[in-house]
């Protein structure tokens, strides 16, 4: 990272601790996580509490992105702008979101990984939240690159990497293994990171 061209990046790894769960398949685990009420409320509260422009990245539009957008949008202050960007949003609208964000200093963009993993550069971005599990190293680094493009007023950016520990005594859950892979990437890239464990209650 060349000095002065890129923001300083801090990574907060937020490990949500669930009661032990056994999942037959990766898909079963994903369904459990993206429909988990407390998990989604945690992401909503984090998005609303952060200062500056915040990008919330999700994987599945209807099942997760739309749910997060609704929760955030219903609970925001009147003067705060919230955008929902996904593959179904045409390029012109995506460009409009980029322009607005570069003018704003406190907007929230709920966006699919696919839309923002490549192509859109937002200079004035302060926070990124990984709301959906993603094991793809390239995708993660592209998402991080989004934050690192330095805006004129910005010195520091923060990535909130949310992961989930549903491990049993005998087995780690799938997405926790993916998180461990991401940590390896952060070490290789020499990013600053801190791991914080947060206790979640069971599913309601």
Features from the language model and the residues they span:
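Long, largely alpha-helical accessory region at the distal end of helicase-like NTP-driven motors
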Residues: 53-54, 191-204
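Post-DEXD/H (motif II) to motif III coupling segment of the RecA-like Helicase ATP-binding lobe
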Residues: 1-12, 186
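Conserved catalytic network of the ASCE P-loop NTPase/AAA+ motor domain
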Residues: 5-7, 47-49, 77, 99-105, ...
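Conserved RecA-like helicase motor-core motifs
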Residues: 55, 69, 73-96
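Short coil/turn segments at beta-strand junctions that form active-site/ligand-binding loops
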Residues: 52-53, 80-81, 105-107
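Conserved RecA-like P-loop NTPase helicase motor core
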Residues: 87-188
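Hydrophobic/aromatic beta-strand patches that form the interior of the parallel beta-sheet core
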Residues: 12-14, 83, 129, 160, ...
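Conserved interdomain hinge at the start of the Helicase C-terminal
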Residues: 10, 20-77
């Amino acid at each position: 990272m060349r000095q002065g061209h890129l923001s300083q990046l801090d990574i907060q790894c937020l490990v949500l601790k669930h009661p032990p769960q056994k999942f037959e398949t990766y898909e079963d685990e994903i369904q459990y996580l993206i429909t988990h009420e407390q998990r989604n409320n945690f992401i909503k509260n984090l998005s609303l509490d952060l200062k500056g422009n915040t990008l919330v990245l999700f994987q599945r539009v209807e099942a997760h992105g739309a749910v997060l957008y609704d929760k955030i949008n219903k609970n925001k202050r009147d003067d705060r702008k919230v955008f929902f960007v996904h593959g179904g949003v045409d390029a012109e609208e995506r460009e409009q979101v980029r322009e607005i964000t570069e003018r704003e200093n406190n907007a929230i963009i709920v966006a699919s990984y696919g839309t923002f993993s490549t192509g859109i550069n937002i200079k004035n971005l302060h926070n990124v939240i990984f709301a959906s599990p993603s094991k793809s190293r390239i995708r993660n680094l592209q998402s991080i690159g989004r934050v690192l493009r330095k805006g004129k007023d910005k010195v520091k950016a923060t990535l909130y990497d949310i992961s989930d520990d549903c491990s049993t005594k005998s087995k780690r859950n799938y997405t926790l293994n993916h998180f461990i892979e991401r940590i390896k990437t952060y070490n290789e890239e020499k990013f600053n990171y801190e791991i914080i464990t947060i206790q979640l209650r069971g599913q309601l």
